[in-house]
Amino acid sequence: MTRLLWLFAAITASLAQDEISQDKWKLARANNYLGLNLLKQLPSNDKTNVFLSPFSVSTAMGMAYAGARGDTLEQLTLNFGYAADELNEGKVLALFKEQLQSTNDLPHDYTLNIANAAVAQEGYGILPEYTDALTSSFGAEYIEADFQKRGQEAIQKINAWVSNRTHGKVQSLFDEPPDFSTRLILLNAIYYKGTWLYEFDKTKTKPRSFYNGGVEKVQVPMMRLKSTLNHTYNAILNADLVDLPYVGNDFSMTIILPREKTGLASLKSVLTSQTLNLALQNMYPKDMKLKLPKFKLDTKYTLKPPLEAMGITKIFSADADLSGISGSRNLYVFDVLHKAVLEVNEEGSEAAAVTGFVIQLRTAAFVTPPPLPKVYVDHPFIFLIRNSKTNTIMFLGEINAL
């Protein structure tokens, strides 16, 4: 018989800040490492946009990580970027707890809701130590459902939870009941709605040219802003970076625009957590003009293939050791689902995302020329919504076509 565990995460874009411990930077680096690697692995082309929430995925993965043991735990520690900063399991869970607490203490300049839940098969023997870890480090609710006999009812309950926690932006994660052998579904939901600190004037939004794939000229609603914004040019990325802060200055959207209209692939090849952090450190205020298209994104991914390509394989195999969940080595992750939604307009941003794991029972150097007085986002670009203090990437995407 096969038993499944699904992990889901729902998120909406833009977070706020808190006093940062040195170790919290390490969790942010691990989050960004995972997110940027996923961006490179997800399928994209000149006509396809990409959007995901690294924060959502890493939180959902973190809840599975809490139940991993042995070589499965070792592989996750390495490929999540924890090993590079010498973070062990205890420290990782402590940092997730600190992150949750600090987020709950944020000011109310925007709407930010974060929730986690564990939906378990009725009567299945989840270890108390595991549920305690989910409650302590992730503030997770514990919910029981019957996936074997009342699968449709269970899925309605889960989809209602997802919709409620994302204010209806993500209305469902499952289109049909999961396999009857599902034993646990881990849910992470985050909803964010933020207002630009410097709003775009709606009367100045006009149809303007955008080059899909860097070559195909189309007309799109283009917003215009004249303001003092943080900006830098990075020679390694060969791109301009512009920061659009949200009210409260805790979160911002960073636009990464390659200088070449067809330069997105080259940009992605050199964009790492290290090159990104160095570029962000070199941003400074400048009076400038910005043109940015309005856009909406709605994406859904199966993350198992890209995660496996990143070296995360044991947790998906018959050799997985998730004995920290039930006390036995008969569970493995069947799949990881992720769904994300974003809208960017003159007022600000609203976003949400959902991530899911299924666990089954077996049977360089910088040169900074004078920055451009104008940044016109009229060709493919990368954007991210980040915590301005820790640089934690909450949402990440690339726009190829509008």
Curated annotation (Swiss-Prot):
Keywords: Blood coagulation cascade inhibiting toxin, Complement system impairing toxin, Glycoprotein, Hemostasis impairing toxin, Immunity, Protease inhibitor, Secreted, Serine protease inhibitor, Signal, Toxin
GO process annotations (BP): immune system process
Signal peptide (residue range): 1-16
TM segment ranges: none
Gene Ontology terms for molecular function: serine-type endopeptidase inhibitor activity; toxin activity
Subcellular location: Secreted
Induction of expression: Induced by blood feeding.
SUPFAM superfamilies registered for this protein in UniProt: Serpins
Chief location: secreted
Entry annotated with the keyword Glycoprotein: yes
PROSITE patterns: SERPIN
GO CC term (a single one): extracellular space
InterPro entries: Serpin_CS, Serpin_dom, Serpin_fam, Serpin_sf, Serpin_sf_1, Serpin_sf_2
Carbohydrate attachment residues: N164, N230
Statement: the UniProt record of this protein carries the keyword Plastid: no
Family: Belongs to the serpin family.
Entry note about domains: Has an unusually long reactive center loop.
Subunit and partners: Interacts with host thrombin/F2. Interacts with host coagulation factor VII/F7 (activated). Interacts with host coagulation factor X/F10 (activated). Interacts with host coagulation factor XII/F12 (activated). Interacts with host coagulation factor IX/F9 (activated). Interacts with host plasmin/PLG. Interacts with host protein C/PROC (activated).
Function: Serine protease inhibitor that modulates blood feeding of ticks on vertebrate species. Inhibits the intrinsic and common pathways of blood coagulation in the host. Inhibits host thrombin, factor VIIa, factor Xa, factor XIa, factor XIIa, plasmin and activated protein C. Inhibits host trypsin and kallikrein. Reduces host complement activity. Does not affect proliferation of CD4+ T-cells and neutrophil migration.
Protein name: Iripin-8
